[in-house]
Amino acid sequence: MSVLPYPLWTRLRRTWRFEKQYRRWQRARGHELGSRDRLPHLVAEYARGKSFVDAGGMWGVDGENAFAAARAGASRAAVLDIMAPTERFEERRRETPIDYVRGDITDPSVAQHVGVVDVVLCAGVLYHHPSPYEVLVGLRRICGETLILRTETIPEMDLPGAAVYLPHLPPADQRRWLGMAGVASQIAVGGAFRPEVTYANWFWLMTPSCVQGLLETAGFLVERHLEEAFSATFVATVVGPAMVHTPDAAEITVTDRHFAPLI
């Protein structure tokens, strides 16, 4: 957080010269800094000798992180995504065997096809889902040891745990957050929400503290937080089950009394 007004602070964080100096200051204070380029190195560090899956690892990267895990010596490497495998991915896995599972991480049946793996990576997914906690619950179902989560974020503000839900905001507010978030015009960010494109929409702008709270609720303990201006990478270990409420028979019976029969 900063003593500067939030719009000014976010504007400064988008300035290359200021951000370079600020990251130098962060490093001197012992903060661990992240970047998109560090992700394959984290994968190699944690996947060596382990089973690995990249959840949402097809769009824009053609399964590259799964191949990085295989190169690092993962015992098994796989990609899980809702989109079909790309031609580039299919070409590369002729030489390097990589499993592919097509499905939605929030679908409980996906865990039956993926199984429980040691290391799970999920990058660039969380803010594209209307229910990010359900994404983390799905990741917890398949994660046996370590989760590497990278997501777009906004800088911390005076209200820890804050987040902004983007769809259906008034246009002026959308433009305001677009300016402060440091992102180019995206669907539902500076533009109208389009339900027909589903997960291509940007649903959330979350602070890192919000993401960490969600992780802990889902049964993870954050061990490392690699900081960036408008992104965050978390390395978290499994410490317990995710909070999931399943109504028992008594609850269902009591609830049903409040509703008239459907005709």
Task: Indicate where each model-derived feature is located.
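Conserved class I S-adenosyl-L-methionine
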Residues: G49-V61
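Conserved alpha-helix/loop element of class I SAM-dependent methyltransferases that forms part
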Residues: R29-K50, A68
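A short SAM/SAH-binding and catalytic strip from SAM-dependent methyltransferases
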Residues: D118-P132
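Residues at the starts of beta-strands that form the adenosine-phosphate
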Residues: S51, S75-R76, T146
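S-adenosyl-L-methionine-dependent methyltransferase catalytic module, highlighting the catalytic core
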Residues: P130-L262
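Class I SAM-dependent methyltransferase SAM/SAH-binding core
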Residues: G60-P108
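A short acidic, Gly/Pro-enriched loop at the edge of an enzyme's catalytic core
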Residues: V110-V120
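N-terminal, positively charged/glycine-rich alpha-helical extensions of SAM-dependent methyltransferases
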Residues: M1-R23
